[in-house]
Amino acid sequence: MSKTDLYEQLLTIEQQAKLTFDGITEMKAVLSKVLEENAELEIENKHLREHLQELQQTTEETDTKDLSQGLSKSKQNLQNLYEEGFHICPYFYGSRRENDEPCAFCNDVIYGERTAD
């Protein structure tokens, strides 16, 4: 191998090394930007979740107040029994609700609209 061939190979390797280095530098910049954006999105996501939780709590409190105010005294008593963990529906009346699971029949008794037949 001649000295000029060896020199040309060395120049080629140097150019490839520069291209590789430039590629790595570009990837590093892109990765840094992506990580920064990810951190910003995580913070924004956290704030949005907190805000959503506040809105849900406010809505639940408002709904509970509205429902309680719109119920007759007897329905409010049934609602209190239901909230204490007892069935108030005709199918399971008086039995305890397991794990305080909701009962569609009980909810229908409390909140369902009755029509006079």
UniProtKB/Swiss-Prot annotation:
The answer to whether the entry has keyword Zinc is: yes
Q: Which GO terms describe its biological process?
A: DNA replication
What does the entry's cofactor note say about binding and number? Answer: Binds 1 zinc ion per subunit.
Has UniProt tagged this entry with the keyword Cytoplasm? yes
What cofactor(s) does the depicted protein rely on? Zn(2+)
User: Where Zn(2+) is bound, by residue?
Assistant: 87, 89, 103, 106
Where are the membrane-spanning stretches? Answer: none
Q: Give a Gene Ontology cellular component term annotated to this protein.
A: nucleoid
Q: Which UniProt keywords apply?
A: Cytoplasm, DNA replication, DNA replication inhibitor, Metal-binding, Zinc
Q: Name one Pfam family in it.
A: YabA
Q: Where found, per UniProt?
A: Cytoplasm, Nucleoid
Q: What does this protein do?
A: Involved in control of chromosome replication initiation. Inhibits the cooperative binding of DnaA to the oriC region, thus negatively regulating initiation of chromosome replication. Inhibits the ability of DnaA-ATP to form a helix on DNA; does not disassemble preformed DnaA-DNA helices. Decreases the residence time of DnaA on the chromosome at its binding sites (oriC, replication forks and promoter-binding sites). Tethers DnaA to the replication machinery via the DNA polymerase beta sliding clamp subunit (dnaN).
Q: Which family does it belong to?
A: Belongs to the YabA family.
Subunit info here reads:
Homotetramer. Interacts with both DnaA and DnaN, acting as a bridge between these two proteins.
- The molecule here is called Replication initiation control protein YabA
Organism field? Latilactobacillus sakei subsp. sakei (strain 23K)
Q: What is the organism lineage in this UniProt record?
A: Bacteria, Bacillati, Bacillota, Bacilli, Lactobacillales
What gene is behind this protein? yabA
